[in-house]
Amino acid sequence: MIPDRLNKIEEKLKQSQSIKESDKAELLDLLSKLKTEITDISDTHSEDVESIVGFAELSAHEATRSDKNPELFDLSLKGLASSVQSLEMSHPMLVFIINRICKMISDLGI
């Protein structure tokens, strides 16, 4: 289930017309790293993983929609960043990846 949801995010990013190819490549690389980190903790932190993936889906949706709503976009990024806070000590790479994704999407001005 989680891998399918992450694959849908990947497809959404690949199909986006609003993201430059170089930025898209970096986001897809970060998503690949996120998949690895999520897989590593999915058995021990299943509820956290559900939240992370859920907010990642929302963030991807808001970032790639044609009629953008800045308020919903900001809320989705805040939710995504908040979803990993409890894992900062035990899984710093996961937190780094999520924070990098949030910053990159935010900086793109999507």
Sequence positions of predicted segments:
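Short terminal alpha-helical segments
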Residues: 1-35
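A structural signal for well-ordered alpha-helices, especially hydrophobic packing surfaces
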Residues: 10-13, 17, 35-42, 56-63, ...
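Short, charged early-sequence alpha-helical segments and their helix-coil boundaries
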Residues: 40-59, 69-72, 98
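Amphipathic alpha-helical binding modules
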Residues: 74-110
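Short, charged, amphipathic alpha-helical segments
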Residues: 25-29, 49-54, 74, 78, ...
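Amphipathic alpha-helical hairpins
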Residues: 55, 64-68, 72-82
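Amphipathic alpha-helical coiled-coil segments with heptad-repeat character
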Residues: 3-6, 17, 24, 42, ...
